[in-house]
Swiss-Prot record:
Listed GO MF terms: arginine-tRNA ligase activity; ATP binding
Localisation per UniProt entry: Cytoplasm
Protein name: Arginine--tRNA ligase
Keyword Hydrolase recorded: no
Keywords in alphabetical order: Aminoacyl-tRNA synthetase, ATP-binding, Cytoplasm, Ligase, Nucleotide-binding, Protein biosynthesis
Classification via Pfam families: Arg_tRNA_synt_N, DALR_1, tRNA-synt_1d
Assigned EC number: 6.1.1.19
Keyword Cytoplasm: yes
Organism in which the protein naturally occurs: Rhodococcus erythropolis (strain PR4 / NBRC 100887)
Subunit structure, interactors included: Monomer.
Biological process, per Gene Ontology: arginyl-tRNA aminoacylation
Membership in a protein family: Belongs to the class-I aminoacyl-tRNA synthetase family.
């Protein structure tokens, strides 16, 4: 019986208790939660449901808890339900109900943990979307790892996810990029507002190789040639880097297409027609404060050029026209203002602002030998995704980016993430899977098979703790999806690995020497198989490998 199963049983029991006494069943929350007590002596799970609803039905919490406990203990799978404190319920499962968790994992296999909370929902997940003016830096690396993991998690809950990269090939940064390439081709320093670094020189050399005549072209044609070829070369490099990192996209959407197709102009005219734009100081402004933004936003500047938000507005319209129910944007720490403006733009078109979600990620810092490693894209000393992977590998790079909440900054200690010890979180989790794989191989060599028919024999404390931890996994995946928080799965996997290592230290899994195999050995092998499956499932959602040996 998983926590979700128990919560469902608990709600049904509480509803029956209230109905039998003529009390209002509607006061019960739609879904209940049960928690694992900090002290295992208090039981397997605890709930405060009696304290939540007692006052609403005119009784006291302990009395209501007593009614629920009496009814609950009569249910299959419940060993005991005891009242504690002001009205808590501490619940123990019987051994068969605990063992059923292991059976459910073995039966579900790679689908264990999947759900349907987002079934049929069309979700556009836009992430990375780095400017094609340089390699992907650490901030983009974080979004690549987190975004890809989130896409996997949303899909595991039934979401129809489209991973999208918004290719910023329109605007002043592209002009600065092309001028920087021309300067490099001439052997001159980069423009003051341009980009520098070895990659600029490399791309400039590639342009010269493809178009030996480029330096003889008129200035405007020359810049356009450097722009077109340079941007394509840079974007090809970005896509290859992401692919090597395990990240691929379903759609690469070109910002410039919004302007060339007239979509931006059409969106602006539509807003003018609806009265959601006003003219002031020679510019056109969106009345975004009418829709909850902290200030009105310039859409068309006084020089007649479109502000960046104009493209954002047209892009959102494009997404909705493609039938997406939810548009998730993953943006950097300097984009807080985009939350209000994107939601306001949606509302201005008569759309539901809740179709827009914006996740803001914080900074990533690199530390080596206790000293921060500085980065600056424009100075040409940027720390890139490729640099990080070269230093600590793909798995560690993805894991370190995912395991922290996106609203907190990360300090990546290169010394820590290259350790082959329990101090390194990804090693700790992967080692648990590798150890379990070794046990499976050794059992096969002994001709010993797992048997889930006698799981009630698993009575050691560490066995019960491991089983209960396995049972938490579906709820963790559901929470990670609904809260858009992939780090919950990484932290859970560390908890599961810890529970497994403690079990391994306390229980002999395979017979030793001339010892005969017993039903306990076979039951423990079943528990090991279930643990291995859950570790593999969780690592797959993070895009991290589950090694068979280390």
């Amino acid at each position: 019986m998983t926590p979700a199963d128990l919560a469902e049983l608990l709600r049904g029991t509480a509803a029956s208790v209230l109905a039998d006494r003529g009390l209002d069943v509607s006061v019960l929350p739609e879904t209940l939660t049960v928690e694992r007590p900090r002290n295992p002596e208090h039981g397997d799970y605890a709930t405060n449901i009696a304290m939540q609803v007692a006052k609403k039905v005119g009784t006291n919490p302990r009395e209501l808890a007593g009614w629920i406990a009496e009814a609950l203990t009569a249910a299959d799978g419940i060993e005991s339900a005891e009242i504690a404190g002001p009205g808590f319920l501490n619940i123990r499962l019987d051994k068969d109900a605990q063992g059923a968790i292991v059976v459910s994992v073995l039966e579900a296999g790679s689908s264990y943990g999947s759900g349907d909370s987002l079934a049929g929902k069309k979700i556009n997940l836009e992430f990375v979307s780095a400017n094609p003016t340089g390699p992907i830096h650490l901030g983009g690396t974080r979004w690549a790892a987190v975004g890809d993991a989130l896409g996997r998690i949303l899909s595991a809950q039934g979401g129809l996810v489209t991973r999208e990269y918004y290719f910023n090939d329109h605007g002043a940064q592209i002009d600065r990029f092309s001028r920087s390439l021309i300067a490099a081709a001439k052997g001159e320093p980069a423009p003051e507002d341009g980009y520098a670094g070895a990659y600029i020189a490399d791309i400039a050399a590639s342009v010269l190789k493809q178009r030996p005549d480029v330096m003889e072209l008129p200035a405007d044609e020359q810049q356009e040639t450097f722009r077109a070829i340079g941007v394509e070369l840079m974007f090809t490099h970005i896509k290859q880097t992401l692919h090597d990192f395990g990240v691929d996209f379903d759609v690469y959407f070109h910002e410039n297409s919004l302007f060339e197709s007239g979509a931006v102009e059409k969106a602006v005219e539509s807003l003018k027609g609806s009265g959601n734009l006003f003219h002031e100081d020679g510019a056109w402004w969106l009345k975004s404060t009418d829709y909850g933004d902290d200030k009105d936003r310039v859409v068309i500047k006084s020089d007649g050029n479109a502000a960046y938000i104009a493209g954002d507005i047209a892009y959102f319209q494009n997404k909705r026209a493609r039938g997406f129910d939810l548009c998730i944007y993953m943006l950097g720490a300097d984009h807080h203002g985009y939350i209000g403006r994107l939601k306001a733009a949606a509302a201005a078109f008569g759309d539901d602002p809740d179709t827009v979600e914006v996740l803001i990620g914080q900074m990533v810092n690199l530390v080596k030998d206790g000293t921060a490693v500085k980065m600056s894209k424009r100075a040409g000393t940027v720390i890139t995704l490729d640099d990080l992977v070269e230093a600590i590998g793909v798995d560690a790079s993805r894991y370190v980016m995912i395991r922290s909440s996106v609203d907190s900054s990360i300090d990546i200690d290169l010394d820590l993430w290259t350790k082959t010890s329990s101090e390194n979180p990804v090693y700790y989790v992967q080692y648990a899977h590798a150890r379990l794989s070794a046990i499976a191989r050794n059992a096969a060599d002994l001709g010993l098979s797992a048997d889930a028919s006698n799981l009630a024999l698993l009575t050691v404390e560490q066995e019960g703790d491991l089983i209960r931890t396995i049972g938490e996994y579906p709820r963790v995946v559901s929470s990670a999806a609904n809260l858009r928080e992939p780090h919950r799965i990484a932290r859970y996997l560390e908890e599961l690995a810890g529970a497994y290592h403690r079990f391994y230290g306390a229980c002999r899994i395979l017979p030793q020497g001339d010892e005969d195999a017993t039903d306990v050995h076979r039951a423990r092998l079943a528990l090991c198989a279930a643990t291995r499956q859950v570790l593999a499932n969780g690592l797959e959602l993070l895009g991290v490998t589950a090694p068979e040996q280390m």
